[in-house]
Curated annotation (Swiss-Prot):
Protein name from the UniProt record: Large ribosomal subunit protein bL19
A GO biological-process term: translation
Miscellaneous comment: Present in outer membrane vesicle formulations which are used as vaccines in human.
Keyword match Protease: no
UniProt keyword Nucleotide-binding, yes or no: no
GO function term, MF aspect, one: structural constituent of ribosome
Gene Ontology terms: cellular component: cytosolic large ribosomal subunit
Record keywords: Ribonucleoprotein, Ribosomal protein
InterPro entries, A to Z: Ribosomal_bL19 (IPR001857), Ribosomal_bL19_CS (IPR018257), Ribosomal_bL19_sf (IPR038657), Translation_prot_SH3-like_sf (IPR008991)
Residue stretches in coiled coil: none
Record function comment: This protein is located at the 30S-50S ribosomal subunit interface and may play a role in the structure and function of the aminoacyl-tRNA binding site.
Similarity-based family: Belongs to the bacterial ribosomal protein bL19 family.
Pfam family, one: Ribosomal_L19
Length: 121
């Protein structure tokens, strides 16, 4: 492990951020700290994770949602101080790591099948 990787690992440990397990296809609610003038508030951004890039401290993910009939995508840094918390609403069952094809789909075609828990027995 080189020096930069070691420093990144120490920084991640210092941040002590609670990050749930999530993958592309999952529907998540990202609580973002928004500062307006002197006031600060939390804004919830709910959508489908279409990509995740794991690069240590520089990890990020893209969340896509439909707002007023228009597709909106937002990229979040995983360890950013503006990202307050990430909550997984539902697990999606997909076979791709990057779901960029959802950009061209609308309505029912853009739905993602829900991943059901494994049956025991």
């Amino acid at each position: 492990m080189n020096l930069i990787q070691q420093l990144e690992q120490e920084e991640i440990a210092r941040l002590n951020k609670e990050i749930p397990e999530f993958a592309p296809g999952d529907t998540v609610v990202v609580s973002v700290r928004v500062v307006e003038g002197t006031r600060s508030r939390l804004q919830a951004y709910e959508g489908v994770v279409i990509a995740r890039r794991n690069r240590g401290l520089n990890s990020n993910f893209i969340v896509r949602k439909i707002s007023s009939g228009e597709g909106v995508e937002r990229t979040f840094q995983l360890y950013s101080p503006t990202v307050e918390k990430i909550e997984v609403k539902r697990r999606g069952d997909v076979r791709r790591a990057k779901l960029y094809y959802l950009r061209g789909l609308t309505g029912k075609a853009a739905r993602i099948k829900e991943k059901l828990p494994a049956r025991k027995g």
